[in-house]
A protein has these predicted regions:
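Cyclic-nucleotide recognition modules
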Residues: 32, 84-146
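Polybasic "coupling" helices that flank or enter modular domains
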Residues: 128-198
């Protein structure tokens, strides 16, 4: 079954897609795997390249294999709100298809990213044949809804300090730390950090400086080192 180990040449390095998308590959039988292997495509996105726009009709399930993706919505006065950040290996772009609506958000590559795309029609074929696969997506949607609920509360009820502390912890959770064990593995502009925390850029800059003065973090350009995680958790908690 050579198709079971679909190897794809990307940038001269072999990428074992089935291994990366094990969550949806494992539940499938050989026939279903062959079907999926014949239907997925790989797409490279450059930094800041748009993957889908607000108002578009969803056609594909996206799976981020490498890189980082931001899901955002352009708000009032040209201010954009980052709804969530996608890390490998995570699935996105399929919720509106199930809801029979267009995209209410946009997605763009935060850095060079590799995305595996599966037509929703092909996914629907597999879902009707495979209960375990269907359960996986029910679970995914449930987890995402839980995270969204929590974020709604955080962004609406917490004060500025609490929101920014929350965002820094959220980025650590999502992307981890560099080898030094304290620098966030994602370098956000002040504007992106503000958009993630639902505040103005000037408030984000001011609050970051406060955190640095209080020795909770150190800042070097876009690099943020977390010095006192416990204190950040406390600030995030009391809001």
């Amino acid at each position: 079954h050579s198709y079971a180990a679909v190897m794809v040449k990307v940038n001269l390095s072999d990428i074992n897609v089935p291994e990366l998308i094990a969550d949806i590959w494992s539940p499938l039988n050989d026939e279903q795997r062959e079907f999926l292997a014949n239907h997925f495509t790989l797409q490279n996105y450059k930094k800041n390249e748009v993957i889908h726009c607000e108002g578009e009709t969803p056609t594909h399930l996206m799976c981020l294999l490498s890189g980082k993706v931001k899901i955002y919505k352009d708000g009032v006065g040209g201010r954009s709100q980052i709804i969530r950040m996608i890390k490998p290996v995570e699935y996105f772009g399929y919720r509106p298809y199930f809801a029979k609506t267009d995209y209410v958000t946009a997605a763009s590559a935060f850095e060079p990213s590799l995305v595996c795309q599966i037509p929703m029609t092909a996914l629907m074929t597999l879902l009707t044949q495979n209960n375990d696969l269907a359960m996986f997506f029910i679970k995914q949607l449930s987890v995402d809804l839980g995270i969204a609920d929590e974020r709604t509360v955080n962004l609406t009820q917490k004060h500025i300090r609490g929101r920014l502390a929350e965002s820094l912890l959220f980025l650590k959770e999502s992307y981890g730390l560099e080898e030094d064990g304290s620098t966030l593995s994602i370098y956000l502009s002040r504007e992106d950090l503000a958009n993630l925390s639902n505040m103005t850029t000037s408030n984000a800059i001011r609050t970051l400086s406060q955190f640095a003065t209080e020795r909770l973090i150190t800042i070097d350009g876009r690099k943020i080192k977390i010095i006192d995680e416990e204190k950040l958790k406390k600030i995030s908690k009391i809001g």
